[in-house]
A protein has these predicted regions:
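Gly/Pro- and small hydrophobic-enriched strand-loop and loop-to-helix capping segments
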Residues: 167-168
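Terminal amphipathic alpha-helical/low-complexity segments used for targeting or macromolecular assembly
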Residues: 1-63
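General secondary-structure edge motif
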Residues: 12, 64-65, 120, 139
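Flexible, glycine/small-residue-enriched loop-and-beta-strand segment within the central core
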Residues: 70-81, 85-154, 162-164
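A glycine-rich, hydrophobic loop/mini-helix early in the fold
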Residues: 57-77
Length: 168
């Protein structure tokens, strides 16, 4: 897998537009998708096997539990120093870093995205994207079906209501 110190990652982290078809990014996404698929094939009752896969998929995050149908783009850009609890159908598009504070709970069908696409169709077709980090503070609850957009900073203690969209 590529390392965040590589040039393409530095381009992403600096907020520049980048090509999503870059070979290093394709390789990293393919690995993450394979690990997500393996994780999602295991029953939730297979705690030890699931934790081993989660540790491989999310090497920079402590995760207490994930429900079924977890998905992420890379996994290596998800950060949590204390365990995060995730429900079913959680999607984290982690082109840029997505960081979680302590005691965060993510309910079912939450989407967290750090990437955006250009408005011009030709640039979208060519695979251009831009990413902005997402920061989620301590003791936050992301309720069912909410969406967190690129660049959002959620302060400590916030409760994002079901179905809400966080834009900043």
């Amino acid at each position: 897998m590529t390392k965040p110190q590589d040039t393409i990652w530095q381009q992403i982290y600096s907020g520049q537009w980048y090509q999503t078809h870059h070979p290093q990014l394709v390789e990293a996404r393919e690995l993450a998708k394979r690990l997500c698929n393996e994780l999602n094939q295991l029953p939730v009752s297979e705690v030890t096997k699931r934790q081993a896969l989660i540790s491989q998929l999310l090497p920079n995050a402590k995760v207490a539990a994930t429900g079924n149908d977890f998905a992420c783009d890379y996994g290596i850009n998800i950060y949590a120093e204390t365990p995060v609890i995730m429900g079913d159908r959680v999607v984290i598009l982690d082109a840029a870093p997505v960081s979680f504070g302590a005691n965060v709970k993510i309910e079912d069908a939450v989407v967290i995205t750090s990437l955006t696409h250009p408005l011009e169709a030709a640039k979208r077709k060519a695979g251009w994207q831009q990413a902005s980090p997402v920061k989620i503070g301590d003791n936050v609850i992301l309720c069912e079906g909410c969406t967190v957009l690129p660049g959002a900073v959620i302060p400590a203690g916030a409760v994002i209501e079901p179905g809400k969209v966080v834009t900043r």
